[in-house]
Design a protein with these regions (language model features):
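Active-site- and interface-proximal helix/loop "cap" or "latch" segments in soluble metabolic
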Residues: 1-43
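An anion/pyrophosphate-binding glycine-rich loop and adjacent beta-alpha core
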Residues: 275, 279-397
Length: 510
């Protein structure tokens, strides 16, 4: 590794919203047993001087998130000499700071919960429907059918630990199928990815920004031109290049260009490096960009920083969403786009997420996200109370209406029938405290558009022709999720297609 650091000064445009990213980087490093040295300009210049201006590899992977690591590790195990380039000072990107739940039909936890009727076909149908029929069904089917093997690879080969007694039931799904990593964040994955890359001797070069794809006279992608600290470098790739650079949710100008409705009201959940330049780099190499206007907002985010409130994942186990008047206004497990729009239609364009210990004992989010709990409490957007009067005083919700709503929810939970919004997972009795409540707003989260690929992760032109030597995986692609990505499908997507791309690129080098 040339340089890896969490020096915020090196993160272009870093703001308060990047703090969670920086904390997550340090957490992942600690769990992996890695110490990240604080970078300075002298260290960066020294690293730049020590790198050869031209390097030869079988496979070059751009982007050190979940898709990039999956591709690089798979390519290395297929016998390829591989390098992983990352423009930021540290690895992980969105894969690091996400909740990292992974949808897998017929996974090993489902039978413990009495779920025996799930299938890759049903997962594919949910995904296609969740994207309003705009996703590529061939690509979707590969994702859902390869999901179990990918999850077992993460568990058995990488050593990723998953909770063995619970799953998340994300909105838009017809079955509870999302595996939950220990710690409820991507730190578990990225720590294990980094450790495996180190074990395999894969060079991970941070602070290295890809600028241009190199094509030979036959139109094949054969390398990458990149820069570090103002110096130019060439990475030749005998087999080809895997693009795994993520989306563009942290680039507000680009977001507004493709979807003017997502304006200054929205902050972003994304890592600072998710700025989309690589999409234009791929386009210059002949790749078609598709579905660029489909940009997802995540409904439950910090009103101050825009970061996802992972602590509010109690919603997946029964927490309810209330408006300022103290009323439920939507089914809490609806699609993210539906929830976001519903919140924006409420007074103040925010909501309150409320749950009690009956739900907390299932979801365990307060314990899993203790740092969030402390931070959000200090910010004044979250509190814990023994009774509903305290909750009403904190939120300024009318107490009588709050009490009425909680009683109705509890009554319907006892009868097993949500007459108001048909909660698909079932409501939970909330008559007794302790109670937890947090204020939430939508933030820009996932960009569904990107490079057009086929089921082999090969990049395609506007005419549908394969661009030889170029593969793409993860959020940089644009055909899997249609208009809307269902929760828990991102990690499934990045692992499945990262592995496919890495194996194909390694094979092409032989």
């Amino acid at each position: 590794m040339a340089l890896s650091s969490t020096d915020v000064d090196l993160v272009s445009g870093a703001t308060f919203s990047a703090k969670g990213f920086i904390d997550a980087v340090n957490d992942a490093a600690k769990k992996a047993g890695v110490t990240l040295a604080k970078a300075d300009k002298k260290a960066l210049k020294k690293a730049a001087r020590e790198l050869p201006k031209t390097s030869n590899y079988d496979v070059v992977v751009i982007g050190a998130g979940g898709a990039g690591f999956s591709a690089a590790i798979t390519a290395r195990n297929a016998g390829a000499n591989v390098v992983l380039l990352e423009k930021m000072p540290a690895v992980g990107g969105n894969s690091l700071i996400s909740g990292a739940e992974m949808n897998v039909a017929k996974n090993w936890v489902q039978p413990k919960l009495g779920i025996n009727d799930d299938s890759p076909e049903l997962h594919a149908q949910d995904t296609f429907k969740g994207g309003d029929g705009k996703g590529d069904m061939k690509v979707i089917n590969v994702m859902t059918h390869e999901a179990l093997d990918a999850a077992k690879w993460c568990r058995d080969y990488l050593g990723v630990r998953f909770e063995d007694d619970n799953l998340f039931f994300f909105g838009g799904h017809s079955r509870k199928r999302a595996l939950i990593p220990v710690g409820h964040t991507g730190t578990e994955f990225i720590a294990k990815f980094q450790a495996k890359a180190d074990e395999l001797g894969i060079p991970v070069i941070t602070n290295m920004k890809a600028e241009e794809l190199i094509k030979n006279k036959d139109g094949r992608v054969v390398g990458v031109k990149a820069t570090m600290d103002g110096s130019e470098y060439t990475f030749n790739a005998k087999g080809g290049v895997v693009l795994a650079t993520g989306g563009f949710g942290a680039n507000p100008e680009m977001v507004k260009k493709y979807n003017p409705k997502i304006d200054e009201r929205f902050k972003t959940t994304d890592a600072p490096g998710t700025t989309g330049e690589a999409l234009y780099m791929a386009e210059r190499a002949g790749a078609q960009l598709v579905n660029m206007g489909y940009i997802q907002t995540y409904p439950i985010c910090d009103p101050i920083s825009g970061a996802i409130e992972l602590i509010a994942d109690a919603r997946f186990d029964g927490a309810i969403m209330l408006n300022q008047e103290g009323k439920r206004f939507v089914e809490e497990l609806q699609r993210r786009d539906v929830l976001s729009e519903a919140i924006l239609n409420q007074t103040g364009q925010y909501c309150w997420v409320l749950w009690n210990d009956n739900i907390g004992k299932i979801s365990n989010t307060v314990k899993a996200h203790a740092n969030e709990y402390e931070a959000f409490t200090k910010q004044g957007i979250m509190t814990t109370c023994d009774d509903l009067k305290c909750i009403a005083d904190f939120t300024k919700i009318p107490f009588d209406q709050l009490r009425k709503t909680v009683k109705r929810v509890s009554d319907m939970a006892g009868k097993g029938n949500d007459k108001d919004f048909n909660h698909r997972s079932g409501l939970v009795d909330m008559q007794q405290g302790k109670y937890y409540v947090i204020k939430a707003v939508p933030s820009t989260h996932h960009t569904m558009g990107g490079v057009r690929i086929n089921e082999k992760a090969e990049a395609l032109t506007a005419e549908g022709k394969v661009i030889p030597g170029l593969w793409a995986a993860g959020e940089v692609t644009g055909v899997t999720h249609g208009t809307n990505r269902l929760g828990g499908n991102a990690y499934t997507d990045i692992i499945v297609f990262g592995r496919i791309a890495g194996e194909a690129a390694a094979k092409a080098a032989k």
